[in-house]
Amino acid sequence: MTIIELLKALLLGFIEGMTEFAPVSSTGHMIIVDDMWLQTTDFLGKYSANTFKIVIQLGSILAVIVVFWKRLFSLIGLYKIEGEHDASGTHKLKLRHVLIGLLPAAVLGLLFEDFIDENLFSIDTVIIGLAAGAILMIAADKLGPKEPKTTSLDQISYRQAALVGLFQCISLWPGFSRSGSTISGGVFLGMNHRTAADFTFIMAVPIMFGASALSLVKNWEYINVGDLGFYVVGFIASFGFALLSIRFFLKLINKIKLVPFAIYRLVLAAVLAVIVYM
C-alpha cells in the first residue's frame, strides 16, 4: 500500500463523509471522483473497490449514530428523553414512524438492486439526478408552506412518515440524494427544514446500515488483508468528516434552506455535462 493510495483513501473518505448527509448526493460525487479520476478499481479490483465504498459508508452511519444516539436509543427503549414530548404523547416519534418511512425505499431497493447497479451507476445518470434533484429542492423551498406546522420530531404523523418514505424512493436514482429527496418531501408536507433533516438522518440509520451490512457480507471474500490500511484510513476519514458535516448542516439548514445546495448541484451538473459531452 503506497502513500498515494492511502491519500486516495483519505480523499474518498472525505468525500463520503462530507456529502453523505448533505443534499448533494454522495453516490454521485463518488462516481464522479472515482470513475473520472481516482479509479480505485485499478489497484483494488472491482469487487474490493466496491467493498471499500461500503466500509466508508459505515463510517458515515456511525457518525449519525453518535449525533443522534439519544433519540435512536429512545426509539428502541434504551433511553428516555425527558420533557421533550407532547404531554398527550399522541405524536411522540416512535419506531413505527421510522419503519413506515424506510419501508418503500427498502422494498424497491431490494427488488431493483441488480438493475440499478448494472444500469444507473454512470456519469450520465448522475448528471440527470443532480439537475432533477436541484429542481425538486428549489420547488420545495418556493412552494412549501411558509409557516411549517411540524417543527419537531414528535409532531411527525404516520401519514407524513409514509409520504416522506415515498420521496426517499426517488433517491434510488444515483445523483438525486437521499437527504435532498426526503428533506424536500418533508418541507412539502409541512415540516420545517431542521425537523425534515432530523427525520431524514434517523431514518437513514437502519436502511443504510442494513444495506451496507448485506453488501459487506456478500463481498466479504474480496477483502484483501493487504488492503486493510486503505479501508481503515477511509473509514476514519469518513466518520470524522461526516461528524463535522452533520453538525454544521443541522445548525444552518433552517437558515439557508435548500436553494444554495440546489444551485451547487445545477452548477456541478452543467460542468459535468460540458466535460462529458463537449
Curated annotation (Swiss-Prot):
The gene is uppP. It is a multi-pass membrane protein. This is Undecaprenyl-diphosphatase. The chain crosses the membrane at residues 49-69, 97-117, 120-140, 197-217, 226-246, 258-278. GO terms for cellular component: plasma membrane. It is found in: Cell membrane. GO terms for molecular function: undecaprenyl-diphosphatase activity. Belongs to the UppP family. Its EC number is 3.6.1.27. HAMAP family: Undec_diphosphatase. InterPro entries: UppP. Bacitracin is thought to be involved in the inhibition of peptidoglycan synthesis by sequestering undecaprenyl diphosphate, thereby reducing the pool of lipid carrier available. It is an enzyme of class 3 (hydrolase). Catalyzes the dephosphorylation of undecaprenyl diphosphate (UPP). Confers resistance to bacitracin. PANTHER family: UNDECAPRENYL-DIPHOSPHATASE. Pfam families: BacA. Its main location: membrane. It catalyses: di-trans,octa-cis-undecaprenyl diphosphate + H2O = di-trans,octa-cis-undecaprenyl phosphate + phosphate + H(+). Keywords: Antibiotic resistance, Cell membrane, Cell shape, Cell wall biogenesis/degradation, Hydrolase, Membrane, Peptidoglycan synthesis, Transmembrane, Transmembrane helix. GO terms for biological process: cell wall organization; peptidoglycan biosynthetic process; regulation of cell shape; response to antibiotic.
